[in-house]
Amino acid sequence: MSHALQLANVHFDYGEDFSLTITELTLNKGEMALISGGSGSGKSTLLWLIAGLLRATSGSITVAGERMDGVSESAADRIRARHIGLVFQTHHLLPEFSAQDNVSLALMAAGEPENTHASRARELLNKLGIERVHVPVANLSVGQQQRVAVARAIVCKPTIVLADEPTASLDQVNASQAMDLIQQACREAGAALLCASHDRAMQSRFERVIQVDSFVSTARAGTKSGARA
């Protein structure tokens, strides 16, 4: 089976405050895995490294057969736009833009044909239950905004979706519905899913649970580092 993700001997230093070492991590295409661990253990750092939002100090990170480490920022941006979907706790949607425009921007970043942007965005949003595609996302409910964020993550049919604490701000009912949506969307898109969460109840949803403690991480008490959660 071909791999969606491969990490080998990856090491990341955040100054003198924090370090993370991943000797090996592989995720197959279509596989769904949970990164589990407490706050500050390095779950978010791992996802940011894979996405190219942080640069590893050493080691190799390969997404869909393309190396993310050691490439230019523009090359990393291209690989991310084409192969990686992102769903974070904070959606980073453009509030004054419509749902359709927010999703279309992902297609534009991936270099998809411009004349297909609107129709592809609208079709996927409708499929995910968003009918008001021309309304600014600031006027949508939290649950609807989550659906827009998921649509943006999968519209380019990525190889892998990275979800960083995607339900942390939701109550139990909405959290369950959000994860149902994310996992179903990934299945239909044929995308692998790597989700980071401190919620142990999430483990039953995944065929594979990876404890971040199985990696080597160190942090000094009283320090803080960008994406460590």
Across the structure, where does each feature detected by a protein language model lie?
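Short coil-to-helix segment of the ABC ATPase nucleotide-binding domain corresponding to the Q-loop/switch region
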Residues: 97-105
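ABC ATPase NBD coupling module
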Residues: 68-85
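Conserved catalytic motifs of ABC-family nucleotide-binding domains
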Residues: 157
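Conserved ABC nucleotide-binding domain
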Residues: 124-138
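Catalytic Walker B motif of ABC-type/P-loop ATPase nucleotide-binding domains
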Residues: 161-164
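Conserved ABC ATPase signature
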Residues: 136-146
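Helix-to-loop junction immediately C-terminal to a conserved catalytic motif
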Residues: 51
